[in-house]
Structures are given as structure tokens and as C-alpha cells.
Amino acid sequence: MEKFTTLTGVAAPLDAANVDTDQIIPKQFLLAVDRKGFGVHLFHERRYLDDAETIENPDFVLNKPAYRSASILVARRNFGNGSSREHAPWTLLDFGIAPSFADIFSNNALGNGLVLVKLAEEEVDELFRILEADPGMKVTVDLVTMTCTAGERTWRFTLDPFRRKCLLEGFDAVSLTLEHEDDIRAREKREPAWLVPHVEDLKSCPV
């Protein structure tokens, strides 16, 4: 997972609450397990007028010229509710700013390096007004200072310290485990053999 400190990019205002994971990436596109190639299907039902994805919906925010290069998505409350699917953060994998996120989506997103910035409802309302007054405006998200800035306005946000550390240092579940491999092996040696089998023993076990 790549390290993250700051991002400055065009912010697209998706003025909708309760956007579920099926809207983010519909179930018919979940067959692949490679993380790449999902972006074209992002918001399939909203973004296209046909199933073949050849006719764009000109009214959808990401299809408007000012937001085609957007790397930040600003949404309303309860973004990412619905079924648990890692394909949703894979499909977005840039940024989301909203008053609240569904718990399962939040865990999947942060585990895949997708930073979720949660602001108060009134702060998100203000951010929407700023973006709507200046389409294509760039917003800066700074994980070091825990701030989000649009024009002359800056808001502070919070994030679980452990999650923040993982994002800043580029740790996912695997790399974080490997970082403590020596400690894990030392713990294994202190435990009874019948309680914690060693990795080498597991490799030799018949299936």
C-alpha cells in the first residue's frame, strides 16, 4: 500500500446521501479479483445511459468537464452502506469526504488505502456551497495536520490513530504483520506446541 501524506486535487460534489456499495460498483462487475480495471464501472447506473457503458449521462457530476479529473469525491451522509465488498473501495480508490460512512465500507476502504474524511453535516454543507460556486476547485486533504482545505476555508477532521499511522506509513494488514514477524515468532516459541503450531509445521501437514 502506498504511503499517504497530502492530496490536492479537483473535488467532485456528489450531492446524494445513502449511496450504497451496489451503486458504487454493481454486482455484475464483481467477478474479477484483480484490483485494477474497476474505475470504468464506478457509479454505473448514474454515470451511463446504457448497459454497455457507451453513452454517458451528461447530468452526472463525474461526466461534467469541470470534474473529469477529480481525485476527491465529496458525498452526503452514510456513504458506502449496503453489502460488504472490497470492490467498492477498489473502484473509488482515491478519496471520499462525507458526514458519515457505513462501518463495513469504512473498514474495507481504510484497509485498501482509501482515506475517508468525516466532517460534520454543516461543514459538508458549507463545502458543497463552496464547490458549487467554483466548479473545478481544488481541495487539499492533509493527513499530517488532519485538515481539509478549500479556498480560504479549512476544517479539521479526526481519524483513528492506528488507521492514520497505517496510511501515513503505507501499511496494510499483510505488511503490518510482516513488520512484527520477529515478535510473532518469539511469541510462538513461548507458547505450548499444541496451542500455537509453527508455520513450518503447518506447511508439512497433509490436506
Question: What would you call each of these model-derived segments?
Answer:
Residues M1-A32, D172-V207:
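N-terminal, positively charged, Ser/Thr/Ala/Gly-biased leader segments
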Residues I25, S106-G111, G151-R153:
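Short acidic, glycine/serine/threonine-rich loops at helix termini
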Residues L31-K138, L143:
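Feature captures the catalytic cores and cofactor-binding loops of soluble hydro-lyases/lyases
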Residues L114-K203:
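Acidic, glycine-rich flexible loop/linker segments
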Residues N18-V19, F79-G80, F162:
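Short, glycine-/Ser/Thr-/acidic-enriched flexible segments
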